[in-house]
A protein has these predicted regions:
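A compositional/biophysical signature of low hydrophobicity enriched in polar/charged and small residues
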Residues: 1-92
Length: 92
């Protein structure tokens, strides 16, 4: 599984519309409105890098309300759910 976070800036007043349109794209799992330098953070999950690249370079760039993106690739996931499962089956 390939996971990426895309930090997104959008045109003024277009946060809600852009978030909804992003959620229509296959592979976009979640979209958050955030404070700070960026307006939205999209969490993307794909089976391969080619599909991720297609969404970031083609689909997202076709949305006229998106003015800037910055993509972060995830190397490893640390989560409470994973840790709890490890304890439950005696790995840890």
């Amino acid at each position: 599984m390939v996971t990426a976070m895309v930090l997104i800036n959008v045109q003024r007043g277009q946060i809600n519309e852009t978030a909804q349109r992003l959620l229509e794209v296959d592979g976009v799992a979640e979209v958050y409105s955030v404070t700070g330098e960026y307006d939205l953070v999209a969490l993307l999950r794909f089976q391969n890098y080619e599909d991720l690249a297609s969404v970031v370079t083609s689909h997202m760039q076709q949305l006229p309300t998106i003015t800037k993106t910055h993509t972060l690739m995830a190397f490893q996931c640390y989560s409470r759910a994973d840790l709890q499962q490890a304890w439950d089956i005696g790995i840890v």
